[in-house]
Amino acid sequence: MSKVAFLGAGSFGTSLGILLGNKGVTVSLWDRDENVINDINVNRKNDKYIKDLTIPTNVTAYKDLDEALNGAEYVVLAVPSHVIRTACKNLKGKINDDVIIINIAKGIEEGTNLRLSQVINQELPNNKVVVLSGPSHAEEVSKGIPTTLVASSECMECAEKVQDLFMDKNFRIYTNDDIIGVEIGGAVKNIIALAAGVCDGIGYGDNSKAALMTRGMAEIARIGIKMGGKAETFFGLTGMGDLIVTCTSMHSRNRRAGILIGQGKTAEEAIEEVGMVVEGIKACKAFYELKEKEGVTMPITDIAYKVLFEGAKAENAVSLLMERDKKKEEI
């Protein structure tokens, strides 16, 4: 049976660790937080991130990275997007070239505007990378609620190995070779979810959210295709599927942050109240720069940028969005 090491014992990493542990896989969870480590190893819980769950005994938490990695055939990067490069640097010289790297973070590297698999390839060029993405909240995965994701890689053999590793009666995995499209969909949908939350916070209704999600889907496809993704990817699980769940669920930290901003809080205040990383804020800045560079029209991203980084009032920004020049509906 395989051994899987997770870098990061947060909500999603822990949930996937539980899933694998229940399948009989040996799982190690590496984290810096000694309280989290003790809670997992002593109490078989991780109350800091997810309540009301029991962690199997074949899931062990470590503070020592070498111990966590010992014997692992797969390493799952379960850390926020802005620390992916640091995490990969920490893996150098500690894993063999045949270890498959599985990334579950969604975002883009701030400053370089690289996709996360590109960052991983820069730091660990000899290891194959698989992106595991799609509509999934840790709170539901940990409870065994039916969930479907995509394992995407340039190496289809690796994607199929990850598919076999995670497939379970309540956890279905499809494979996909469009890693560009999968990563762009997973990153941009966080911006749209923020905007959807803002609409909820202002008090707008279902009409507004339906329009925003639909036109947001167009923005995702537009920038994704420009960057080399396949059109069909954006209408699958990692595009439309992920967009739906992130824009509509209260499990979504991006939507929750957007609600707070719509109610008048600043981005900084919203992040503090949510208490976890809000990837859509960093993604908004990165894709604002990328769409300028690539010459892609992304009006929702434009408006989100004005609210997040230029101090525009949410209601005024929505008016700007609605009052643009008339045009034909198209992607």
Swiss-Prot record:
GO terms for molecular function: glycerol-3-phosphate dehydrogenase [NAD(P)+] activity; NAD binding. GO terms for cellular component: cytosol. Its EC number is 1.1.1.94. It is found in: Cytoplasm. Gene3D superfamilies: N-(1-d-carboxylethyl)-l-norvaline Dehydrogenase, domain 2, NAD(P)-binding Rossmann-like Domain. Sn-glycerol 3-phosphate binds at residues 106, 134, 136, 189, 242, 252-254. This is Glycerol-3-phosphate dehydrogenase [NAD(P)+]. It comes from Clostridium perfringens (strain 13 / Type A). The lineage of its organism: Bacteria, Bacillati, Bacillota, Clostridia, Eubacteriales.
